[in-house]
């Protein structure tokens, strides 16, 4: 990060988890604040150009986050299936709300040396509060391919099965739960496939990726 962030002087190679993950999030937030742009998880497969999502996200509130399935025990106390996730976020250059998020992450890095922030869902709760205040835009899960057209959660069983999945017409991509694939023994076979094998597999995910 030091090549694109003049004030970044932390060597992440010598930092251990979970501090390393929080510092990486902080650095990415600073990149977005400095240059503007959009952050996507590596397991998000795009169907189309995302410029319309970016423009809609920054139009009124300057910063936006995606609504993704809560798989980490994080989020609000009412245990919503979906919650705001900074795995997918973006902003305009010099966004003041992103600066607030940076300050928030710096506080976490200064005080939290465990995985507690993941389980409590501090980031999700921070974002949710600002979404409710209409200061932050939430990109709906249907648009991000985490629910079908009827609002049903796209489970790993559905994605790696061969029954038809009816996505929303406005879906710009599909979010692949990569950590679930690695965690669940029954589906680790998919992680071992080559790119070509994954695309030609008899799965709905393979069909949507081609």
Question: Across the structure, where does each feature detected by a protein language model lie?
Answer:
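Small-residue hinge/turn detector
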Residues: 25-37
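Glycosyltransferase-associated regions of secretory-pathway enzymes
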Residues: 1-24, 42-210
């Amino acid at each position: 990060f030091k090549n694109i962030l003049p004030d970044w002087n932390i060597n992440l190679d010598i930092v251990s988890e979970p501090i390393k993950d929080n510092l990486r999030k902080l650095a990415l937030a600073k990149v977005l604040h400095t240059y503007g742009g959009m952050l996507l998880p590596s397991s998000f497969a795009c169907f189309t150009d995302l410029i319309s999502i970016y423009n809609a996200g920054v139009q009124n509130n300057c910063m936006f986050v995606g609504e993704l399935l809560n798989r980490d025990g994080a989020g609000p106390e009412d245990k919503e299936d979906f919650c705001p996730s900074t795995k997918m976020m973006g902003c305009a250059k010099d966004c003041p709300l992103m600066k607030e998020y940076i300050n928030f992450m710096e506080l976490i890095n200064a005080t939290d040396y465990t995985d507690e922030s993941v389980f409590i869902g501090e980031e999700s709760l921070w974002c949710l509060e600002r979404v409710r205040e209409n200061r932050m835009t939430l990109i709906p899960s249907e648009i991000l391919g985490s629910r079908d057209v009827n609002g049903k959660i796209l489970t790993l069983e559905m994605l790696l099965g061969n029954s038809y999945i009816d996505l929303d017409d406005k879906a710009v991509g599909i979010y692949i739960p990569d950590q679930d694939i690695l965690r669940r023994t029954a589906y680790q076979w998919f992680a071992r496939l080559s790119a070509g094998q994954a695309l030609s597999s008899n799965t709905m995910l393979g069909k949507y990726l081609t």
